[in-house]
Amino acid sequence: MHFKLLSLAALAGLSVASPLNLDERQLGSSSGNDLRDGDCKPVTFIFARASTEPGLLGMSTGPAVCNDLKADASLGGVACQGVGPKYTAGLAENALPQGTSSAAINEAKELFELAASKCPDTRIVAGGYSQGTAVMHGAIPDLSDEIKDKIAGVVLFGDTRNKQDGGQIKNFPKDKIKIYCATGDLVCDGTLVVTAAHFTYVANTGEASKWLEQQLASMPASTSTSSSSSSSSSAPASQTSQSSGLSSWFSGLGN
């Protein structure tokens, strides 16, 4: 376990030194605090970023999905809310029993409850990346049935609780969950070993956004319904823009 945490720490430094190429659509301009600070919108997107990512939405999958949803005029407006600041996205929290801190899970629950109480007519979609997926796995099961019914869909990228929770979020309909686990991403197999595949999920955000839009389209505008069939999926590995030298470094993690 100690070696794996050291690997994560080293990886954080390398990911800063050799970031993936992100265009303006992916970086976006949302503060990630729209629910707390702004007016109610027809749709609320709640997202938990990956470990070490800055801000409330992070700088990869969160802003990309947020901006895709905001660009869909048919939704009538979207409030994007990141989980934080109690969720610090620290590396060490990955080793906790729930894959993140209790403070992070409780904060996410409070945001879902805030969306439902402040904006009773809003429809909710959610997501998480890496440690952020553990935040969603921890928060959603304990929500009231009324709030769960308001959630149209949840997208999880590089799901660190995929194996532990059986490819689902407990006590939540499987047809409302879309899991992206790239080939070779070992965190999806229940480990803390991070490989290059864990950084490929920006390539899946367009598909994930469209899926959330489809989920919203199937939900009535002011109320929501839940169901129980399964549609959780795995995504193929996509090419990373990092150097071959970095890839070689990753290949030695498990040795």
Curated annotation (Swiss-Prot):
Q: How does activity depend on temperature?
A: Optimum temperature is 60 degrees Celsius.
Q: What does UniProt list as catalytic?
A: S130, D185, H198
- Which GO BP terms sit in this record? carbohydrate catabolic process
Domain of life according to the entry: Eukaryota
Give the location in the cell.
Secreted
Q: Could you say which residues form the signal peptide? A: 1-17
Q: What is this protein called?
A: Cutinase 2
Q: Which organism is it from?
A: Emericella nidulans (strain FGSC A4 / ATCC 38163 / CBS 112.46 / NRRL 194 / M139)
- Origin organism lineage: Eukaryota, Fungi, Dikarya, Ascomycota, Pezizomycotina
